[in-house]
Regions:
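Serine/threonine-rich, repeat-prone extracellular segments and beta-strand-based repeat modules
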Residues: 12-53, 71-73, 92-135, 151, ...
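Solvent-exposed, low-complexity, repeat-rich "mucin-like" stalks and linkers
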Residues: 1-12, 61-92, 141-172
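Flexible, low-complexity linkers/stalks enriched in Thr/Pro that connect modular domains
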Residues: 55-60, 135-140
């Protein structure tokens, strides 16, 4: 802070600016209202009415929030999501990370895109620009098909073949056995080696091997 100063004139002594006594308690490190006083007396001891200047030291700078970790973040459905958090710094208050308010609607049980928001304000009420993190909950895990019955299966020509089937489970959708597509070219009238294939995909398009 550089004070602009004052001038003083006297009808008898003329310009007595150099005789002004200035007193100031301004502390630019601390927000507050301060006073600068100006006093002067002429050569004959006549004191001027004290003049004061009010100096307001303010903090109007908004804090800055910095995300930690990935943005966007991707997590497999069903996994545990631990937010990486954020830090917040303020020119006046310093580190105000502990004051961050985090709001999250992440549901790891449901595939989708979610948002985590981070807000903070300093001691003087200056609010940071809200920072957001996008969290994508995805399902990339393949279903698993489990055969029932024997493999390989041996039949006599002319026997009736009833396929034992298979089951299918998915980490996200659960039991998807009913979605299995079975393709078979078995002809029990003709000796040979045949293949029965089982395919399934979950609701998110992940196809079993």
């Amino acid at each position: 802070y550089t004070d602009a100063g004052a001038t003083a004139t006297d009808t008898y002594d003329g310009d007595i600016t150099s005789s002004i006594v200035t007193q100031s308690n301004v502390d630019i490190a601390i927000v507050g209202t301060y006073t600068v006083t100006y006093d002067v007396a002429d050569a004959n001891g006549n004191a001027a009415i004290t003049v004061t200047r009010t100096v307001n030291v303010v903090d109007t700078t908004v804090p800055v929030i910095t995300l930690l970790g990935d943005n966007p973040a991707t997590i497999e459905a069903g996994d545990t999501y631990t937010d990486a958090g954020a830090t917040a710094t303020d020119t006046y208050d310093g580190d105000i990370t502990s004051s961050i308010v985090t709001q999250s609607n992440v549901d790891i049980a449901i595939v989708g895109t979610y948002t985590v928001t981070y807000d903070v304000a300093d001691a003087n009420g200056n609010a940071a620009i809200t920072v957001t993190r996008t969290v994508n909950v995805v399902d990339t895990t393949l279903p698993v098909i489990t055969l029932l019955g024997d493999n390989p299966v041996t039949l006599e020509v002319g026997d009736t073949y009833t396929d034992a089937g298979a089951t299918a489970t998915d980490t996200y959708d659960g039991d998807i056995t009913s979605s299995i597509v079975t393709i078979s070219n078995v002809d029990t009238a003709i000796a040979g080696t045949y293949t029965v294939t089982y395919d399934v995909a979950d609701a998110n398009g992940n196809a079993a091997i």
